[in-house]
Amino acid sequence: MMKCVVLVILGLTLLLGTQAMPSSRLSCYRKLLKDRNCHNLPEGRADLKLIDENVQHHFWEGKGCEMICYCNFSELLCCPKDVFFGPKISFVIPCNSH
């Protein structure tokens, strides 16, 4: 009986410990804008590209098309595209990585 209890506790400890370890998955983060203005983005920011003229205040961040930033008043909210739009919608968002 004692052996069974020890095994259950050890199993739960291992299970909870592996879930608590950081994953390599990208997460969301915020960046404050110096001039608190979304209208002049992406001027002066080589790492931001407008997604589409019809989609205001949404930018691709970096060279690829994995992170999307939304300009909201005085900050940029950046998330992986699957988190931002969801996996069913994110694959139809136009990506021009050039």
From Swiss-Prot:
Organism lineage: Eukaryota, Metazoa, Chordata, Craniata, Vertebrata
Domain of life, per lineage: Eukaryota
Source species: Rattus norvegicus
Keyword Ribonucleoprotein: no
Name of this chain's protein: Scrapie-responsive protein 1
PANTHER family per UniProt: SCRAPIE-RESPONSIVE PROTEIN 1, SCRAPIE-RESPONSIVE PROTEIN 1 SCRG1
Encoding gene per record: Scrg1
Disulfide bonds: none
Sequence similarity: Belongs to the SCRG1 family.
UniProt keyword Glycoprotein present: yes
GO CC term (a single one): neuron projection terminus
Chief location category: secreted
